[in-house]
């Protein structure tokens, strides 16, 4: 998919937003049950992540992901978007996402011509207690990015087609904290993208795949 086509489709987000594929949702095989409290009633910390689309060398659309360093406080070794908790000086969740992207991958939003397109459905992250809002944006040209060594082991520009409705979703079983889970994951290079990141990408793919 060309980046111009993707951006054109995303300029007017549907209301309501389509759901991510059900195959991505986790099933608890063992351990404590999942909380039944609605998202809006959970005690949580506001956070923002940047879902940044950038053109590949051939003009197709890619999305920037990070592989977290092993041994970090949360999400050690996992694939995620640049982002983190809101700080008091942040004007809004968009400011949070852009600030965190500058800190984690060295994004200069002005130099890259970043344009914010909107926000996707918030996700609650049980392990960190974050209420995460995905901020959708694109850059008109490929930005110069550098991983912050204390947080990011590498930066991945994943093809957007890897998350469209026809994309492969692998079924995985793993121990996550106190729970044994079965969940769906997107294969990207030598990694598996799962959890909240996969659900955000699945919703993005559902938006782009609508007729």
Predicted regions and their residues:
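N-terminal leader/linker segments that precede catalytic domains of diphosphate-processing enzymes
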Residues: 1-80, 85-143, 173-211
């Amino acid at each position: 998919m060309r980046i111009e086509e993707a951006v054109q489709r995303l300029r007017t987000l549907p209301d309501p937003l389509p759901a991510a594929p059900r195959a991505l949702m986790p099933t608890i095989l063992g351990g404590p049950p999942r909380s039944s409290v609605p998202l809006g009633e959970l005690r949580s910390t506001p956070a923002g992540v940047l879902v940044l689309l950038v053109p590949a060398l051939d003009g197709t659309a890619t999305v920037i992901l990070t592989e977290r360093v092993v041994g970090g406080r949360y999400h050690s070794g996992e694939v995620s978007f640049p982002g983190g908790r809101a700080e008091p000086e942040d004007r809004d969740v968009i400011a949070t996402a852009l600030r965190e992207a500058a800190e984690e991958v060295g994004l200069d939003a002005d130099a890259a011509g970043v344009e914010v397109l909107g926000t996707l459905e918030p996700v609650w992250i049980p392990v960190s207690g974050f209420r995460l809002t995905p901020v959708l944006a694109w850059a008109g040209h490929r930005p110069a990015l550098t991983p912050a060594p204390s947080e990011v082991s590498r930066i991945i520009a994943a093809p957007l087609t890897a998350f469209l409705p026809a994309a492969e979703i692998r079924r995985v079983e793993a121990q996550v904290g106190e729970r044994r889970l079965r969940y769906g994951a997107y294969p990207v290079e030598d990694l598996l993208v799962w959890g909240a990141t996969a659900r955000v990408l699945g919703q993005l793919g559902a938006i782009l795949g609508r007729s």
